[in-house]
Curated annotation (Swiss-Prot):
This is 5-keto-4-deoxy-D-glucarate aldolase. The lineage of its organism: Bacteria, Pseudomonadati, Pseudomonadota, Gammaproteobacteria, Enterobacterales. One of its GO terms (molecular function) is magnesium ion binding. The keyword Transferase does not apply. The active site is at 50 (proton acceptor). Homohexamer; trimer of dimers. Substrate binds at residues 151, 178-179. GO terms for biological process: D-glucarate catabolic process; galactarate catabolic process. Catalyzes the reversible retro-aldol cleavage of both 5-keto-4-deoxy-D-glucarate and 2-keto-3-deoxy-D-glucarate to pyruvate and tartronic semialdehyde. Keywords: Lyase, Magnesium, Metal-binding. Pfam families: HpcH_HpaI. Its cofactor is Mg(2+). It catalyses: 5-dehydro-4-deoxy-D-glucarate = 2-hydroxy-3-oxopropanoate + pyruvate; 2-dehydro-3-deoxy-D-glucarate = 2-hydroxy-3-oxopropanoate + pyruvate.
Length: 256
């Protein structure tokens, strides 16, 4: 049995600034997540912030993705070490941390994923993340194979984005367009010019410090524009959005 889980190919792809197209898993269901895992996306976000997920619902989804080539990214509900530790222990290696506003908060997120002395991650010798103690050199390899993506979604985050991007251990900077729009006074209008300028600034700041940038963009024209602006990892839709759109289209086709 091959118990090798490293190296982290998604982390390596981000470091090489290779475009990674992703999708959001918001339905919190292993079957819908398994279907997305068959589609060929480079990465999938299993959302534990806005979707009804916790460790008990995420484990079946990770199992459903076992044969998938898509990298699994978890968006944690908050930047708390104990939450991140539990996500590590169930098998996540890629983290999207919401509402990061300072370099100190970014550094805390990184430290939460690292074993001492580089960080503060608690040690369990046997858990799902290390295949219950069967992964060779897990403790030696883990720290350098965890990826941290920090989410900028406030004016304070925009103001501090250069320091955040420069933080050691941060692998990428992600824009939360809806919350950013709300924070800038344009709730429900991420297309507002002020929001778009802020997004460009975030992308440019990440690039300045050699870090890839990402964003959620379920509208194709938006996604393509952000890729042209230099975004590296772009989530182009969600299972919920695709399901809602397709079912409405099907119903409309027969009820009109």
């Amino acid at each position: 049995m091959d118990n090798a889980i490293f190296p982290n190919k998604f982390k390596a792809a981000l470091a090489a600034h290779q475009v990674q197209i992703g999708c959001w898993c918001a339905l919190a269901n292993p079957i819908s997540t398994e279907v997305l895992g068959l589609a060929g996306f480079d990465w999938l976000v299993l959302d534990a912030e806005h979707a009804p997920n916790d460790v008990t619902t995420l484990i079946p989804q990770l199992m459903a993705l076992k044969g998938s080539s898509s990298a699994q990214v978890v968006r944690v509900p908050t930047n708390e070490p104990i939450i991140i530790k539990r996500m590590l222990d169930i098998g996540f290696y890629n983290f999207l941390v919401p509402f990061v506003e300072t370099a100190e908060q970014a550094a805390q997120a990184v430290a939460s994923t690292r074993y001492p002395p580089e960080g503060i991650r608690g040690v369990s010798v046997s858990h799902r993340g290390n295949m219950f103690g069967t992964v060779p050199d897990y403790f030696a390899q883990s720290n350098k194979n965890i990826s941290i993506l920090v989410q900028i979604e406030s004016q304070t985050g925009v103001d501090n984005v250069e320091a955040i991007a420069a933080t050691e251990g941060v692998d990428g900077v992600f824009v939360g367009p809806s919350d950013l729009a709300a924070a800038l006074g344009h709730l429900g209008n991420a297309s507002h010019p002020e929001v778009q300028r802020a997004i460009q600034h975030i992308f440019a700041s990440a690039k300045k410090h050699g870090k890839p940038s990402g964003i959620l963009a379920p509208v194709e024209a938006d996604a393509r524009r952000y890729l042209e602006w230099g975004a590296t990892f772009v989530a182009v839709g969600s299972d919920l959005g695709v399901f809602r759109s397709a079912t409405q289209k099907l119903a409309d086709a027969f009820k009109k």
